[in-house]
């Protein structure tokens, strides 16, 4: 009887997970990006902390290390734990290809090494440099807040993950930190 109970529990868990995957698969990238952006904006009432950012990036890297690209759907949509406190996790590789951006899905598959912020900083080149040299670290640049067009100062924590699909960089950023705090993170 215990075996039957365990089998039924496993069956229902697998059925739930399969259904969750089907729900995500049914949404087109545009719908999922809008849902992700709405979730990000809705969660902005809570301000992210430096510790919160690092914790989420570390958790993202653990997930990527285990599952590789198969984990990407877990980073998108209104129920993603990786969309939080007005921010989100994105993933790119060391060649500068955006692998997964939950809000700007049109960047997925694009080489972003040529992207510069308004100050002329090649932000993804800088992020990859930090990851290659240190494994993880902070980078500051100008980037629009979710739902806005104009860029604001953002500082992001990026970390290298060795996954079944190769090396990937997971990143997450925060806006509106005091300049002194940003300078401290950057080692200035």
Show which residues each predicted segment covers:
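N-terminal membrane-sensor/transducer module of prokaryotic signaling receptors
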Residues: 2-9, 20-188
